[in-house]
Regions:
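Metal-dependent phosphoesterases centered on the DNase I-like endonuclease/exonuclease/phosphatase
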Residues: 1-99
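Short acidic, gly/pro-rich beta-turn/loop elements at beta-sheet edges
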Residues: 31, 113, 125
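Pocket-edge structural micro-motifs
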Residues: 85, 101, 105-106, 119
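Active-site beta-strand termini and strand-to-loop segments that position acidic
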Residues: 94, 105-106, 131-136
Length: 137
């Protein structure tokens, strides 16, 4: 994972960008339903969370990206989940994790206006997240 940072730094020197998709890491305790019991599980391991923190940290040690969903919804928990295990009744009981992200350079993140985690139709164990940005192409 550490090898990804030089690529992001080079990209930031060229242009603004959005990195979005399934990162497979729940960054903070509010990003999953049962954080206490998942501290030793992949997706919430300390080293994974540290990598994510570094991804969001500005300065020489980090990539300085912005978690756009958290910018728009800083305290949201249960409605923020984008993944549910296929075991048990995880989806029905909303025992989920927030593993999917829109990460953006600060200039683009500042243009984010609204977000939506689409749960109307279940396509897979993940729900897509969309963000509306205030700019035209």
């Amino acid at each position: 994972l550490a090898g990804f940072f030089p690529h992001l730094e080079a990209l930031k020197k060229e242009r603004e960008f959005v990195l979005c998709g399934d990162i497979n890491i729940a960054h903070q305790q509010i990003d999953l339903k049962n954080w206490r019991s998942n501290q030793k599980n992949s997706g919430f391991l300390p080293e994974e969370r540290a990598w994510m923190t570094r991804l969001l940290h500005a300065g020489t040690e980090g990539a300085g990206l912005v978690d756009v969903y958290r910018k728009l919804q800083p305290d949201t928990t249960d409605s923020a989940y984008t993944w549910w295990s296929n075991r048990g009744q995880a989806y029905a009981n909303n025992v989920g994790w927030r593993l999917d992200y829109h990460l953006a350079t600060p200039a683009i993140a500042a243009l984010a206006r609204t977000e939506e985690i689409y749960k109307t139709i279940k396509f897979s164990d993940h729900a897509p997240i969309t963000v509306d940005y205030d700019f035209t192409l």
